[in-house]
Structures are given as C-alpha cells and as structure tokens.
C-alpha cells in the first residue's frame, strides 16, 4: 500500500531543502505510529542525501530502496558539467549506520539518468 508520494520541489520553489525524501520523513512523523514507521519501506529514484538520510533516521523510518546511488548521480553531473553537489556525497549508511538499505537497481539507472538530465535542462 502506497501511503505517501512526492517529488522534488527545489526547482519550483528555489528551496534546496525541498527533497521528497525529507517530505516523506516529515509526513511519516506526523501521520504514522513509531511501529508503522519502523515497518515502512521507502522507495526512491535516488539515494538519500545526508539531510534526507538523517531525517529518515531521526523519525525511525524502515528500509530504503533506491534506484541510483549518490555516487552515480555525482558522476553524471560531472559528465554533464552542471556543477558540483552543494554537500559532500556519502552513502546513506555513512550518515545513518543502522538503516537497512538496498540499491542501486542497475536496470533502472538509465531511466533515472534521463530524468535527471531533463531536470538539469539538458536534452535526453
């Protein structure tokens, strides 16, 4: 059962903290019990950044499944020459070592890559 869905609101708001992964953590804290949060599985197209990984851990959300890693995204951004990430890239478990994490999912990498190219204003 899907309980919450969101997307990045950074481009439309100019607010670099408007990540969907952080919104998931905020929604879960307000709407789920601690037990429900612990049992929840969060699916994302990209690995959580440090801010989102911390939020996920602080509210006690369960397993994370991500399609592409932060390292993959950093490599693509470097290839496209669209600028560095505003924070250092770290795997989720470097920020929140007790979270259960699965990813990346290689068969989804090219779809996510195309999505990120478009969001960077580049042709697919």
Task: Enumerate the language-model features and the residues they cover.
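Short connector loops at helix/strand junctions that flank enzyme active sites
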Residues: 19, 37-38, 59
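Immediate flanking context of iron-sulfur cluster ligation sites
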Residues: 34-46
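A short, polar/charged loop-to-alpha-helix boundary motif
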Residues: 9-27
């Amino acid at each position: 059962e899907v309980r919450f869905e969101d997307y990045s609101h950074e481009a439309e708001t100019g607010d670099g903290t408007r990540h969907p992964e952080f919104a998931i953590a905020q929604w879960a804290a307000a709407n789920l019990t601690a037990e429900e949060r612990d049992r929840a599985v969060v699916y994302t197209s990209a690995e959580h950044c440090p801010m989102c990984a911390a939020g996920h851990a602080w509210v006690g959300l369960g397993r994370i499944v991500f399609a592409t890693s932060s390292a993959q995204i950093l490599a693509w951004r470097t290839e496209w020459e669209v600028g560095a990430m505003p924070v250092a890239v770290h795997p989720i478990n470097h920020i929140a070592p007790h979270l259960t994490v699965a990813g990346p999912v290689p068969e989804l990498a090219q779809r996510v890559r195309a999505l990120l190219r478009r969001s960077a204003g580049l042709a697919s």
